[in-house]
Amino acid sequence: DRTCYPVASCNLQDFHNLVDVYLDAVFHPRCVDNEKTFQQEGWHYELDSADQEMTYKGVVYNEMKGVYSSPDSVLAREAQQALFPDNTYGVDSGGDPTVIPKLSFEEFKDFHGKFYHPSNSRMWFYGDDDVEERLKILDSFLCEFDKKEIDSTIGTQKYFTEPKRVVASYVAGEGEEADKSFVQ
């Protein structure tokens, strides 16, 4: 339901530079303007040699493969999906590596354009630096956007009428016995 970008520095010039970098990265990311960047960061096909199978690669894709290989993460995700099957809390924000390759560049751009807009944001500053300077920095980014009505309402999960049992599987670690690997 949110993405947080905390920025801090004891050096005021560094802080202002970081705010510029973060605002630019959030509201003007290269991956929504350049399909090659989307492919590098998200996912793409890769062929190391002609005699091997084509594989999926990408920064996010590889990170999520790592997340999905941890028994703790697998079981926590299964619990979240079982508890919240009807709203966003049951969905993994990083993406399921088996589904990530189905995301098109256009779908990604549309999602970013809808939800990563200043009209759908909250910004806080804390500190004893000049408030006017902060507002000038924000204005330099926000002035180019028009206000949009964005429905980012998250529906309430319906109550369960009976107990729910979830059985999930995951890959046991190397050297572990599958039947004794993990219980939670």
Regions found by a protein language model. Name each.
Residues 1-183:
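Charge-rich, well-structured scaffold segments of protease-associated domains
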